[in-house]
Structures are given as C-alpha cells and as structure tokens.
Amino acid sequence: MKKIFRYLVLSFAVLMLVACGKPDSQKAFEERFKEFNSVLTKQMEGADEGSKKMAEIISKATYTVNKVEEKGNNTELNVTIKAVNLGKYINEYVAAVTEKYGVNVSADKQEEFNKFSVDYFTNLLNDKNIEYVETEVNVQMQKSEEGWVITNPNDLVSATLGGAGNLIGL
C-alpha cells in the first residue's frame, strides 16, 4: 500500500512539473527576444562609438509575459516591454545637436559631433535615474516548419525602442 501511495504521489508531482512548464511559443518568444539583442550588438561591432552606445541602451529592454493563448498553430502573447524612454532622449539629443551645430553638421565639425554623440549616450547609459517606459504588446506568433515565428515584429521592435519607433517609421 505504501509503494502504491508513493508511486501516486511521485506521479502527481511529475505531472505538476510538466503541467507548469512554459508553452513552446513562450519559449520561442524568449529566444527571439534574446536573439534580437545579440544580433543588434553584432550589427554594431563595426559601427561608430555612438551607434554602439545606442545599441547598449536598446539592449537594456526587458520583458514580462503576462498571458499566453495558444490556439493550434497560432499564439497570442500579451507581453509588457520595459525599455529606456528613447523617444524622449532622442528628442533631447536632436535639440542639443541642433542648438550646438545647427541643422547640418559641417565636415570640419564632424569629429567634434561624434565625440558629443558618444558623450551624450555614455552619460545616458551611466545615469542612475534613466527613465523607462512600459508598453504592453500583443505578440502574434505562428507555428511553421522552422518553429514559432513572430508575425507582427514591428510592434515588438517599436516597444523595445522605448517610444523611438515612430521616429524611424514603425
């Protein structure tokens, strides 16, 4: 009788662990989010220092999966993205650049402009009171032969850019 009871308790515990696992689509989303940050960092390896700093700022974005609804080969994940408020900071940067250099930066001021940009974004990275925005996104995913694919990536990228997505047309 004790053996049967132990077996039932053990079986129940295993079922609870399996049932409490994350859905495959959520795991795929988490992988894609990490890939986005690593691809962004790789893309910036040969770029100027200002662009590298911007990539570091974007990489500070985090997410929380609030809800997952799987319906066959389609899934909707309700996700909250917490990202640096780039919309605000880029507007401040553009205003500072325009004030200091005008609308067009002359060739002889290019090096000074690059240093200004690097300093601005470095200071932003080091700011302990940096402002974040939280954006709720409904991420649509579809299962294909290659696995789960995000079908509305622009919404996710826009949220990850912290309000700066509209500045680049997203």
What do the PLM-derived regions correspond to, one by one?
Residues V39-N78:
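Post-signal-peptide N-terminal segment of Sec-exported extracytoplasmic proteins
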Residues E76-T80, N138-Q140:
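Beta-strand secondary-structure signal
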Residues M16-A19:
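C-terminal motif of bacterial Sec signal peptides marking the signal peptidase cleavage site
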Residues G102-V103, Y132-G169:
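Short beta-strand edge/turn micro-motifs at domain boundaries
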Residues M1-L8:
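Bacterial N-terminal signal peptides that target proteins for export
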Residues I81-G87, K143-E145:
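Beta-strand elements of well-folded, non-transmembrane domains
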Residues G21-D24:
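Bacterial signal peptide processing site
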Residues N85-Y132:
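Mixed-charge, low-complexity intrinsically disordered segments
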